[in-house]
Design a protein with these regions (language model features):
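Residue-level detector of alpha-helix initiation sites
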Residues: 89, 155-156, 180
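Ferredoxin-type iron-sulfur electron-transfer modules and their immediate structural context
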Residues: 1-148
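Fold-independent oxyanion-binding glycine-rich loops
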Residues: 111, 122, 154, 177-178
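Generic beta-strand/beta-sheet core signal
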Residues: 50, 152, 175-177
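Gly/Ser/Thr-rich beta-alpha loop segments that engage phosphate groups in nucleotides
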Residues: 53, 155-157, 184-185, 190
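N-terminal Rossmann-like FAD-binding beta1-loop-alpha1 element of flavoenzymes
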Residues: 147-173
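Rossmann-like dinucleotide-binding cores of NAD(P)H-dependent redox enzymes
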Residues: 171-174, 178-195
Length: 195
């Protein structure tokens, strides 16, 4: 048997570090500290690579979670970012506000006795670091169709819809009654949760 099958025993789940209470009392920015590739790669290495990945099944977007965990374990950040973005218009947001403990992490096989892989932390690291390094999604169609779609509402659903259509070569115009896009992401989620 491969050594990979037992890393989850030796490497314990480590929650993301939070800023001190003294800092958080006067600062309403994001509460989690930045992490690094070593910590994230170590947590990603805990993934068993299940034959039937319940984490992927339980994710509403059916993200390729075991695949991008493997890529991060191998320090292949840009490929992991491409894969994250293939199924998700907002991986940088889902890594922060998605209730992973009820979805992907809640379905992780390791929950039975060993604690789940920190999937949300890894997803946040992948998208944040890739964006900081200038990464841009590569999945847009070079062939434009003759179609044009108008989308009412520039919230998460409207933006995700536009992004999906643009990937398929369909031009979009998004309309919203507010001056800034984002809907709930902009007007409903506090900055300490989504900066």
């Amino acid at each position: 048997m491969s050594e990979k099958n037992y890393e989850f025993i030796d490497i314990k789940r480590i929650e993301p570090e939070t800023k001190s209470l003294n800092v958080r009392k006067v600062d309403f920015s994001e509460i989690y500290e930045q992490t690094n590739i070593k910590k994230v790669s170590e947590q990603a290495s805990r993934c068993l690579g299940c034959g039937n990945p319940y984490c992927e099944w339980k994710c509403p977007l059916h993200n390729y979670i075991p695949d991008w965990l493997k890529l991060i374990e191998e320090n292949r950040l840009e490929e992991a970012a491409d894969l994250c973005h293939e199924t998700n218009a907002f991986p940088e947001i889902c890594g922060r506000i998605c209730p992973q403990e009820k979805l992907c992490e809640g379905a992780c096989t390791l929950n039975t006795g060993y604690e789940a892989v920190t999937i949300g932390q890894v997803e946040k690291y992948i998208s944040d670091t890739a964006l900081e390094q200038g990464w841009k999604p590569k999945k847009y169609s070079e062939k434009q169709t003759k179609f044009h779609v108008s989308i009412i509402g520039a919230g998460p659903a409207g933006i995700a819809c536009a992004e999906t259509l643009i990937r398929r070569g369909i031009n979009c115009t998004v309309y919203d009654k507010y001056s800034e896009i984002g809907g709930l992401l902009t007007y409903g989620i506090p900055v300490f949760k989504l900066e």
